[in-house]
A protein has these predicted regions:
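N-terminal module detector in large eukaryotic regulators
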Residues: 1-173
Length: 173
């Protein structure tokens, strides 16, 4: 059974400060502040050792969920600049996605002055094919527990190739 899922998107980057560069949807002030903050560089980074990373968080009182990917903006002259492509979905739609690997294809690293694609809503055809069943659920439960069992911020270094997509898989559970 196939269904179409609507995915809104934003692009943040450096333009006289880290800010929203393009969006497919109008974002209210409260959500904009949160997305602006969470799309900026997380922590200290050295350009040569920068590792792309994902961020996920709810907006609109949990009705929507943002999954974002951040890259170092090597092409910018100012040190510490990043690009962040955020995908905004209805929380209920995330549970319908059968294969979380789709996010690998939806995230697009921008090119300077080529931002038009980020102003379009993405219509993702969910085929219902479940190929996420290969994940080690015990390991994922441990990672999720590590991340969320404390009020202190935590991180997990994703040294294994598929850990990122496995964590995305857990978002829908």
């Amino acid at each position: 059974m196939s269904s179409v899922i609507k995915v809104e998107q934003t692009l943040h980057g450096y333009a006289n400060g880290h800010q929203l560069i393009a969006a497919s949807v109008k974002i209210n002030a409260e959500n904009k502040r949160l997305i602006d903050e969470l799309s900026d560089l997380s922590g200290i980074c050295e350009e040569k050792n920068f590792i792309d990373y994902y961020t996920g968080y709810p907006i609109d009182d949990g009705k929507k969920y943002v999954i974002a990917k951040t890259w170092y903006a090597y092409e910018k002259q100012r040190p510490g600049c990043v690009w962040t492509h955020s995908l905004i979905l209805d929380t209920e739609d995330i549970r319908k996605i059968s294969c979380m690997r789709i996010f690998e294809k939806l995230f697009t690293r921008p090119r300077i002055n080529d931002y038009n694609n980020y102003t379009n809503t993405i219509l993702y055809e969910n085929t219902g094919e479940d190929i996420d069943s290969q994940y080690d659920m015990e390991k994922l439960q441990y990672v999720i527990y590590t991340l969320f069992s404390s009020a202190k911020p935590r991180y997990v270094h994703a040294s294994e190739v598929h850990l990122e997509e496995e964590l995305l898989f857990m978002v829908k559970k």
